[in-house]
Amino acid sequence: MAEIAVEVVYALPERQALLRLSVPAGTSAREAVLLSGIAEAFPGLDVQGCPLGIFGKLLARPEERVLEAGERVEIYRPLIADPKEVRKQRAARARSEREGG
């Protein structure tokens, strides 16, 4: 069976990894992450359930998305803070600075 070249990437604030690998044609995004062995480098990473994307686009069903040659599978981390709450805090700070506080 033919093989295709893909990349699997994961990043923490202090450490990043980009793994290049060859996988059989027909491999899904989730399968590529499992085949990459990235979980060994990042203990605690839930490769079975973590959200995945390709070139910045979140995949709804990474188990079903068949990869094409040259694609980069990105492993996403959960958000640390609620984006709405962060915006509210930023707006409150800006308002307070404008009012001279």
Curated annotation (Swiss-Prot):
Protein name: UPF0125 protein PA4766
InterPro entries named in the record: Mopterin_synth/thiamin_S_b (IPR016155), RnfH (IPR005346), RnfH_sf (IPR037021)
Entries under Gene3D superfamilies matching the protein: RnfH-like
Pfam family, one: Ub-RnfH
Superkingdom of the source species: Bacteria
PANTHER family: UPF0125 PROTEIN RATB
Assigned protein family: Belongs to the UPF0125 (RnfH) family.
Organism: Pseudomonas aeruginosa (strain ATCC 15692 / DSM 22644 / CIP 104116 / JCM 14847 / LMG 12228 / 1C / PRS 101 / PAO1)
